[in-house]
Amino acid sequence: MENTQSGFIGFIIRGSLVKQILVGLIAGIILALVSTQAALAVGLLGTLFVGALKAVAPVLVLMLVMASIANHKQGQKTSIRPILFLYLLGTFSAALIAVAVSFMFPSTLVLATQNSDIAAPGGIVEVLKGLLNSVIANPIHALLNANYIGILAWAVGLGIALRHAADTTKALINDMSNAVTVVVRVVIRFAPLGIFGLVASTMAETGFGVLLGYAHLLVVLIGCMLLVALVVNPLIVYWKIRRNPYPLVFACLRESGVTAFFTRSSAANIPVNMEMCKKMNLNEDTYSVSIPLGATINMAGAAITITVLTLAAVHTLGIAVDLPTALLLSVVAAICACGASGVAGGSLLLIPLACGMFGIPNEIAMQVVAVGFIIGVLQDSAETALNSSTDVIFTAAACQADDARLANPDPLASRKSV
């Protein structure tokens, strides 16, 4: 009996997180089908899990970045520049794919009058201005509001200043960073329960019947995201590491993408991505900066959403689009996507900005945004899964390109699963 109990407890504490998440996923679906009321009640588990991740993520980013820069040794190599290039290349490539697929399989929308009091950004300059304003935010305000651009700016500044501090001070900062990491690991162990609650409550609240009317649009959107995740990203990774990219890609989708799909928050998934980078033995000086930065500017999924929904509105209204305009839309969508994390409503609220390129009135553009919110159950989940998993994929690719010793047929084989 004791052996049975210890075996069960061992599975809970040290077992594969992915397998446990799968159990939670199936249990959530079953509960939603059996009892709507019970499914809505367990939604609290999902709310608590996402809340815990969002609470710990800003502190984790601040401490990790500050500790890694403060303890950085002169001449030690990092891969931030190549990763930034991969982020921008991936986002622009995603926008191009979305344009191509939207022309091959044009979508149309049934636009109904929809009043909305949400203010969309007025232009690209406004989006970029908001991004720059995030850099100079008050540090306490940045932590409280999960402003990762501001947190990164302060962490880098304090880290550089602390490089001249006493060794005991650096050791204290490092110990604090390790302590926060332990808290993060504990929170992540509750992922199966959190996802059980999220799946059960989401299915009970919305079901999937409401999505059937937008089946074609969803197929185009999710098809683009799958194409980027399974074809474009592997091609970029292969170009970078010159090896079979799929073991790395599938490992990242499995470990990072699955969790991000259900939490629907790149910020909440930062601790998961950090832990995965640690399991792959990547350079902490690199991933402690690139992962939170990726959660802010690496937005391939957002670029796809902006492009597909904008072109759906264009096709619905019968507006002709030539090739140069389509290419310009790709650039605009990529730039907008990089600022999506700083806009309330994310990628959907940047659609009116892209629609403005084609002279579409704001009233109609906001109706397109309303359609986006209707399909958000799947659209936002798939978008976040692509965005967040790509952060780890490109970080790992850049690190492996710089250090061939990190290459492994199974990227996570060197250590046990979380």
From Swiss-Prot:
Species in which this protein is naturally found: Yersinia enterocolitica serotype O:8 / biotype 1B (strain NCTC 13174 / 8081)
Entry keywords, A to Z: Amino-acid transport, Cell inner membrane, Cell membrane, Membrane, Symport, Transmembrane, Transmembrane helix, Transport
Function: Involved in the import of serine and threonine into the cell, with the concomitant import of sodium (symport system).
Recorded catalytic activity of this chain's protein: L-serine(in) + Na(+)(in) = L-serine(out) + Na(+)(out); L-threonine(in) + Na(+)(in) = L-threonine(out) + Na(+)(out)
UniProt-listed NCBIfam families: PRK13628.1
Gene3D superfamilies, alphabetized: Sodium:dicarboxylate symporter (1.10.3860.10)
GO CC annotations on file: plasma membrane
Pfam families listed in its UniProt record: SDF
PANTHER family (UniProt xref): PROTON/GLUTAMATE-ASPARTATE SYMPORTER, SERINE_THREONINE TRANSPORTER SSTT
Entry protein name: Serine/threonine transporter SstT
Signal peptide range in chain numbering: none
Family: Belongs to the dicarboxylate/amino acid:cation symporter (DAACS) (TC 2.A.23) family.
GO biological process: serine transport; threonine transport
